[in-house]
Every structure is written in C-alpha cells, then in structure tokens.
Amino acid sequence: MPELPEVETIKETLKLFVCNKTIKHIDIEWPNMIKHPDDVEEFKALVTGQTIRSMGRKGKFLLFYLDEYVLISHLRMEGKYSVHSPGDPVKKHTHVTFYFSNGEELRYNDVRKFGTMHVYPIGEEFMHKPLNQLGPDPFDTSFNLEYFYEKLKRTDRYIKTALLDQSIVTGLGNIYVDETLFRANVHPLKRCSKLSKQEVKKLQINAKETLRDAIKAGGTTIRSYVNTQGDMGMFQQDLYVYGQHSKPCRVCGADIIKIKVGGRGTHLCPTCQPNKQGVR
C-alpha cells in the first residue's frame, strides 16, 4: 500500500499535469469505488465542469481541490494515476477516467479495485469520513511531543500497533513504522505505556526524518509502486530493516529478524532494538 512518502510523491507529480485543467466528463467503470455521494451520476455531476485548482494530501489520502469541491482519493493497495493523450492505449484495470477540456485524460488504474473516492464541498472535507477519523499528519504542527506522548502513555498496546493506528498519527504504514522504530532504537513489542518521554521524542523525530528521506528518494518500490510518470521510488535501497530479513544490520552487523506484531510482519535488529521487557 502506498504510504505517506509515495502519496506525497504522487501529489507533487500530479500537480505538474492536472492543475488548472477542467474536467469535461468522467467515465466510471467500477462504481463501487465511489463512496460519496454513493450515486455515481451525482458524483459525476458534482465534478464535471470543475477545474482542478490545487493538490493536497492528508496521510495516505490524495486531495484534488476543485472550484467548489474536494475529491478525496485513497489508493489503497495498488491504485495508480497516470496522465494520457487521446488515443493512448487503455490499460486493463483502468476504472475511472477524467477527460479534460484540453483533450488530455487522467486515468485511475487499480488491479485490486480497493481504491475509494469521496467528494465534499470545500470546507467540509475534514468533517466527514474518511478524513474526520484521522490523527494529525506527521508534518502538521499539531503532531508535537506533548500530543504524541499523551496519546501513547494512555494505551498499553505495542508501539508497532499504535504507530499503525491512523487515528493517532496518519500516513505511517508497515514500511515506515519498522524503519522509524529502528532509527529510534525502540523494540516494536514495547508497550506504549512504558515509553519514556525521551523515547517518544526520538520516535517523533525519527518518524519525520524517515519520511523526509523517503520523499526525497521518491518513495519506496517493493512490488508495484510507481509515481504518475511511471517512475519507481528509490528508498528501498536505503531501508535498514524492512525486507532485510537475515541480512546483516548496516549499523551493528547482527542479523535482521522478522516477527509478527498484531498479525503484521515486522522487521528489526535485535541488537539495535533490544527487547528489554522480554516480550514475545
């Protein structure tokens, strides 16, 4: 699933191609993707004739700011946007096409068909699902140490599980949680209530640094992620633990191990991230 750095990269590349383009009409081949309004014809009517004025992002969600509305798009597992000229071959699994008045087309392709789209009036986008259920973005000023520490100390969950909770902080997924925990020298099975304020500060700082580094590298391509121009991310070359099972740690040389935390595959260095609680 594209996480914050991948969605940020997609947002920035989309800005180059879709801003100030007017949507002439829309084809929707998989209506189940349209979540609000749930009537596809109403969805089309709201968006048709609107010009894309700017692009935004909240966590893993793309935000298309139109004249009067905001189109909220979640790529889920395999969703991809690409811009095409008229007559370009249409790939299999292209489920939504936005036709611009200049003849260009913005196509949404999704092998798994898990992606979602919502439309709300500008100013109401954070009042409804899905955005109203999200915690702060890691780059929001509201994601400060006091907020983060208060949230974590109130729960006895494993820190790995808490960092994946989008209501605490939004945008982190399995890749960047594992990398953040490694950089902060925190074991994924440590209970949140047992974290010191200094450990929480290290998590906050390293989450931001990890995400910034990944954004600079264009995201991480593990399986199929590419940006709007079809370019792969490069951050997979800089991963310390994720996907590095049995390889030597780049910091200490110990073998990276893989465990399960809350049903999620989790990578760590047992030396750099000691399990001081002895939890299995």
Swiss-Prot record:
**Domain of life where this protein originates:** Bacteria
SUPFAM superfamilies recorded:
Glucocorticoid receptor-like (DNA-binding domain), N-terminal domain of MutM-like DNA repair proteins, S13-like H2TH domain
Enumerate the InterPro entries for this protein.
DNA_glyclase/AP_lyase_DNA-bd (IPR015886), DNA_glyclase_Znf_dom_DNA_BS (IPR015887), Formamido-pyr_DNA_Glyclase (IPR020629), FPG_cat (IPR012319), MutM-like_N-ter (IPR035937), Ribosomal_uS13-like_H2TH (IPR010979), Znf_DNA_glyclase/AP_lyase (IPR000214), Znf_FPG/IleRS (IPR010663)
Which protein, by its recorded name, is this? Formamidopyrimidine-DNA glycosylase
Q: Where does DNA bind?
A: 93, 112
Q: Where are the zinc fingers (FPG-type)?
A: 240-274
The record's function comment reads: Involved in base excision repair of DNA damaged by oxidation or by mutagenic agents. Acts as a DNA glycosylase that recognizes and removes damaged bases. Has a preference for oxidized purines, such as 7,8-dihydro-8-oxoguanine (8-oxoG). Has AP (apurinic/apyrimidinic) lyase activity and introduces nicks in the DNA strand. Cleaves the DNA backbone by beta-delta elimination to generate a single-strand break at the site of the removed base with both 3'- and 5'-phosphates.
Instruction: Name the cystine pairs.
Output: none
Gene behind this protein:
mutM
Q: Which organism is it from?
A: Oceanobacillus iheyensis (strain DSM 14371 / CIP 107618 / JCM 11309 / KCTC 3954 / HTE831)
| Quaternary context | Monomer.
Q: How is the cofactor bound?
A: Binds 1 zinc ion per subunit.
> What are the required cofactors?
Zn(2+)
N-terminal signal peptide: none
